[in-house]
Amino acid sequence: MRNNKTPFLSAIFTASIRGYQRFFSAFTFSSCRFYPTCSNYALWLLCFESPLVAMGKIAIRILSCNPFCSGGIAYPTTRLKRPSLLQSHKDFNRNFKTITFWLVPTTKSRATYYIIKV
């Protein structure tokens, strides 16, 4: 479920986060209070949300990463339409791609899912 609304902006943000992971984060000790790390959280959100919504959620996540927060496991969430499970066997085999993410429904709403990378 790639975000195709603004692929250019998503590509710029994704490239900058990958650059941060490769060149800056690789030379510092691992000190993230959350799982997934803030940079992985950002990459996962950019796959499912529009870049502006993703940047808002990423900013909240980065602001919550401070000494006064206990951290823990905090998966990103997204709102999606429930996928149709009524597909023929032929369509499923033809359209099947490698599973990259699990979308686990939250208890808040049927349209809100946790994004978990496989």
Curated annotation (Swiss-Prot):
GO terms for cellular component: plasma membrane. Pfam families: YidD. Coiled coil: none annotated. Signal peptide: none annotated. It is a peripheral membrane protein. Keywords: Cell inner membrane, Cell membrane, Membrane. It is found in: Cell inner membrane. Its main location: membrane. Belongs to the UPF0161 family. Could be involved in insertion of integral membrane proteins into the membrane. This is Putative membrane protein insertion efficiency factor.
